[in-house]
Amino acid sequence: MKPSKILADLISSATGAKTHYDVWWAQMSDAKPQHVDVMNEHNDFFRASQDAHYMACFIYLAHLFDKRSDSSSLPTYLTAIRSSTDPTKFQDIEARFSALARRAAPLVTVRHKLVAHVDAGLSEKDVFGPLKITWNEIRSIIYDSAAFVEELAGAPHQGAVGIPRSGRLSEATLKLLRALK
C-alpha cells in the first residue's frame, strides 16, 4: 500500500468529518435562534441537509479509525510509514494516535449503532447515554483528528492541505441563511 494514497484518503475523510460536522452544527445550534423562520420556510431542504450532514460526519470520522488492514485509515497509514520513520518520532506519533483513537471510540460506536448499522433495539438516546459524551467533546475529537491528519501530511498551517479552518463552514452556513432572509 502506498502511504501517499492512504494519506490523500485520510485528508479527504478528515475534510469530510470536519466539514459535515460544522454545517450540521450551524444548522442545529448556531442558526436556530436567528434563522428558525427561514429554516421552517425551507423545511424539507433543512431536514434533509441536517440528516445528511449528521450521518456523513460520523461516517468520515470512522474512516480515520477503521482497524481493517485493507482500509485507508490512520492505523493502516501508521503501519505503512513505520519502517521509513525515525523510531523516536514514530513512537510519539503512535502514542498520540492511541490517545486520539481512545477519545474517538465513542463516535465510532455512534457510527456503528446509529448510522451504518442501525441497531433495531436502540434509540439515539440509548446509544449516546452510556457514552457520556458532549457535543463540545465530539467537536473537539473531530477537530483534533483533522489536525492530526494535517500534521501527518506536513501541513505548515491549518487549511494548507484542504481541510477547512475551524468554523469556516459554520460561518458559510450562517451566511447562506442570512442571504435567504
Task: Locate each region found by the language model.
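Amphipathic alpha-helical interface segments
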Residues: 1-103, 128-181
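Histidine-centered, metal-coordinating catalytic motifs and their short helical/loop contexts
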Residues: 97-126
